[in-house]
Amino acid sequence: MSRHFRTHTTSRLTFPSSSGGLAITRLPFSSTSSKLLLQQLSSTSPAAAATAVTITTSSPARNLQRARASAAEQGMEEHGKAAVGWAARDDSGVLSPYNFSRRAQKDDDVTIKVLYCGICHTDLHVVKNDWGNAMYPVVPGHEIVGVVTGVGAGVTKFKAGDTVGVGFFVGSCRTCDSCGKGYENYCPTMVITSNGKDYGGAATQGGFSDAIVVNEHYVLRVPAGLPLDGAAPLLCAGVTVYSPMVIHGLNAPGKHVGVVGLGGLGHVAVKFAKAFGMRVTVISTSPGKRREALEHLGADEFLVSRDAGQMAAAAGTMDGILNTVSAWHPVAPLFALMKPMAQMVFVGAPTRPLELPAYAIVPGGKGITGNCVGGIRDCQAMLDFAGEHGITAEVEVIKMDYVNTAMERLEKNDVRYRFVIDVAGSSLGGSGDDKI
């Protein structure tokens, strides 16, 4: 958008309009200072200049005062609330204090003070630009729990003081087939919470920050009684395993589900499956996780995938498998564990291509599918179910100044099972030197 305007002998002022065209307004300039003020406004805020040109010039001093007030109001509309978070500036992934502005609260927006934010493996990939799409500076975080501090005039679902959550995305078109079916998570123009672009083209910044402004449609109610630190990872990890279990019928009492991997996703999957009343077998390459799976998480069986005897004994017994592992691993042998027509759902995303010969799935009519988080309807249902059954993630709570160490540990899988940042209890710092 151009930031220049021209004055003509007819005292007409031309400046860029918010819609991309040219807006022309008559302004009888009777004061040189008014001209200078408008020039200054136009160089910093065309929209503020547009407002200022409607002021008459019968009283230059009053005009200047009103124009400055209009500029201040316009600045609030354009830049919103000052915020501070921790951002990565390059692919070193190192996070440090970062000052920026949240958008101004609109009629259908909810303003949230961030209390806790989980750290997801996706955050690690983003800050290190592992996927080549990082938009630095980037404030990570999409497992957000907080308290409502303000609502727009049109908000009907929330009020100040409500405990709420925000997950992986904060926008969708709400007109496509996926949105119509309640799967906003598959909307082709979905706006992700961090390292995305909103519909106005601005970069989205996540929950490693003190506050966030979100359209009420994408805000979730956190049930009373759930520990907020343990609830935060449910906004991503929880719905990522809950949603496909419901979609594929792996939520029926008495059915047998296999859970591959016992990490951040896997341990939550075991909790949900047991709450559904299912028979649960944890499948792992690590025999040392047996006790954790059986005694602490309540799984019914533990299967070492490298043990041919154990694999043979369990062949054809499972109604479905939820594969939560994000590292490459042999998958063909796992299909032998499933009954005919059963599905293996991938919620982890190894970067190396899977090796899957057709004979692993064709003879039994077995299927392979994937899942990415869940829609708003499923996410709220997941939180409500978690509240009823007391399900939370197993977490290690940290302060923000430990976040870089936590990222290093996460890269080594040195966490049981999720890191959660106590944002409200941290000193976020911030110098004001890098506002956007």
From Swiss-Prot:
Which SMART domains does the UniProt record give?
Answer: PKS_ER
Keyword list (alphabetical) reads: Lignin biosynthesis, Metal-binding, NADP, Oxidoreductase, Zinc
Its pathway, per UniProt, is: Aromatic compound metabolism; phenylpropanoid biosynthesis
Query: What EC number(s) does the entry state?
Result: 1.1.1.195
How would you classify this enzyme at the top EC level?
oxidoreductase
Record-listed Zn(2+) 1 binding positions: 120, 142-143, 236
Q: What's the domain of life for this entry? A: Eukaryota
Binding-site list for Zn(2+) 2: 173, 176, 179, 187
> Which GO annotations describe the biological process of this protein?
lignin biosynthetic process
Q: Which cofactor does it need?
A: Zn(2+)
The entry's function note states: Involved in lignin biosynthesis. Catalyzes the final step specific for the production of lignin monomers. Catalyzes the NADPH-dependent reduction of coniferaldehyde, 5-hydroxyconiferaldehyde, sinapaldehyde, 4-coumaraldehyde and caffeyl aldehyde to their respective alcohols.
Protein's name according to its UniProt entry:
Probable cinnamyl alcohol dehydrogenase 8B
Annotated gene: CAD8B
